[in-house]
């Protein structure tokens, strides 16, 4: 799930995440087992690449960037111009879901073109006052339907929403809300 402060930020003003609670109740192994494809924005990917922590065995990783070069990052696939059609095609493949792992700008772009099916948010019991918002401006309106929730002992509130879709932008595959057991992929915002 994407960690957010109660006031709607996914990171502090300088990208800091020291306020995020690593709750032992959350089953991270089970969480990662739901995905066979990761989708990241450049700003989320770059610190991972510097730490040599970009990608997981058996999981395809795609990075949306207009500036990164494929030759510099052989363990991931860089998606430049036309990335939207590639993501749309990935969603039509059989397999597990796609994990949209940051950031806010990529989330906003995918939401705007109808390529996000589920939003899973972990609201941390903290107000940070400023930072990188979950949905950066210019934000769009998106109707959501609550599908599950959980309150953890740490005070984290986990919320899962299905996105009520409008028709996608011209040239992209229609998006359907899919169950996890569906053979086709679902794009899920989780972090």
Place the predicted regions along the sequence by residue.
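Enzymes that bind and transform nitrogen-containing heteroaromatic metabolites
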Residues: 1-191
């Amino acid at each position: 799930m994407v960690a957010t402060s109660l006031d709607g930020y996914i990171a502090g003003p300088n990208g800091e995440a020291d306020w995020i609670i690593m709750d032992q109740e959350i089953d991270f192994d089970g969480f990662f087992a739901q995905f066979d494809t990761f989708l990241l924005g450049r700003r989320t990917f770059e610190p991972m690449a510097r730490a040599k922590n970009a990608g997981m065995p058996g999981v395809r990783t795609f990075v949306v960037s207009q500036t990164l070069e494929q030759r510099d990052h052989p363990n991931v696939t860089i998606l430049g111009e036309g990335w939207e059609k590639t993501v749309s095609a990935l969603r039509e493949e059989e397999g597990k879901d796609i994990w949209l792992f940051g950031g806010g700008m990529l989330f906003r772009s995918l939401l705007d073109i109808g390529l996000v099916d589920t939003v899973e948010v972990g609201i941390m019991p903290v107000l940070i006052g400023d930072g990188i918002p979950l949905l950066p401006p210019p934000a769009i309106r998106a109707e959501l339907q609550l599908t599950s929730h959980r309150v953890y002992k740490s005070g984290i509130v986990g919320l899962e929403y299905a996105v009520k879709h409008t028709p996608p932008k011209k040239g992209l595959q229609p998006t359907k809300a899919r169950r996890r057991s569906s053979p086709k992929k679902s794009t899920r915002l989780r972090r």
